[in-house]
């Protein structure tokens, strides 16, 4: 039988775990430390660690202010948690009541597309980036209460058309739910090509 950790040990490990992965849920922490969710919440309160939503918001705001050039914060669908311009980006989107069809609690597809598309725009290292073309695929329906993690990767910065190719894969947990390939127009191309997309 495994010996239970003392409160002090548990809180130190909890703090370290959240510092390593600020997006871990209270439920996952409770399972990891074999305590109730309420115990995790009390530990977080004692340690002055904010709830998951506030931790995500803090990281998203910090990343956006430091890195995103092409979109204002309020125009991004989902919250950007990691970004390296012209390389990769990650965002989280919580599916709420206003995002689903009332009769079946399934997320409307345009929300998943908007998360992926705004992430593809945000990852571009330009003041202006527009979607010229996209190819998307919905793999399975996303439901109310699920958290969608979109991961964008820049595949080709300047292809033969002078466009940037961004691939986005969206997951719920480990399960792939959406994929998209976005051909992005960059503002640096505007002066070279005139105003055609």
Curated annotation (Swiss-Prot):
Cysteine pairs bridged by disulfides in the record: none
Its job: Transcriptional factor involved in regulation of membrane lipid biosynthesis by repressing genes involved in fatty acid and phospholipid metabolism.
One Gene Ontology term of the molecular function aspect: DNA binding
A UniProt-annotated Pfam family: 4HBT
Keywords in alphabetical order: DNA-binding, Fatty acid biosynthesis, Fatty acid metabolism, Lipid biosynthesis, Lipid metabolism, Repressor, Transcription, Transcription regulation
Protein source organism: Bacillus cytotoxicus (strain DSM 22905 / CIP 110041 / 391-98 / NVH 391-98)
Family statement drawn from the similarity comment of this UniProt entry: Belongs to the FapR family.
Gene name per UniProt: fapR
Stored InterPro entries: HotDog_dom_sf, Thioestr_dom, Transcription_factor_FapR, WH-like_DNA-bd_sf, WH_DNA-bd_sf
Protein's name in the database: Transcription factor FapR
Gene Ontology terms describing biological process: fatty acid biosynthetic process; negative regulation of DNA-templated transcription; negative regulation of fatty acid biosynthetic process
Domain of life: Bacteria
